[in-house]
Amino acid sequence: MSGVRLDKIVKSYGSTVAVNDVSLDIREGEFLTLLGPSGCGKTTTLRLISGFIQPTSGAIHFGNKDVTGIAPQHRQIGMVFQDYALFPHLTVSENIGFGLVERRYDKAAIKKRVDELLALIKLEEAADRYPSEISGGQAQRVAVARAVAHPPSVLLMDEPLGALDLKLRETMQTELRRIQQELGITAVYVTHDQAEAMNMSDRIVVMNAGIIEQIGSPKGI
């Protein structure tokens, strides 16, 4: 786990500036939300942090390490999207443990970590079910567990609750916040939903037209 620092980040696509001179300190262990309308630069900022795209100028640090130009697989990030992207042919347990298998953890360590995460997301009874046999909210919890199975420096979430109905979305806001707090992990969350940002965040970054308009606590925004 580490904090994240963006220093004078610019991302341009030809003559279009998607992110314009953004500087931001994300504190270690905090839940920070990037809030704004479509096209404001919030998802581009998240993708810059992840390493999926590179800045036109500026630098990105995880803790004291400059990760600018480093590929996503070498940044030790966890990613959760609106599309859960669970493997349909793998059980819940196998989905959670997939990254650990890829990293050649031994079987005992994989089982121990998967069991810990099943308890954390309260899905022990669904361990042997397939994605088609669980609900959307359960699938999203599995996606989060998979993202943090190998402890990441930072957990990045791109509108992960957007496909859920309102009641389930509100429940999952509480669940995601609980999971993040229990793990003590640094989390960056993207949404256009102001109520969602207010309910979940330690701090909110309001973005518009590629710039940061305001940063503050939910009470201060």
Residue ranges and their predicted role:
Residues 35-37:
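The feature captures the beta-strand-to-loop junction immediately N-terminal to the Walker
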Residues 75-78, 83-221:
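ABC ATPase nucleotide-binding domains
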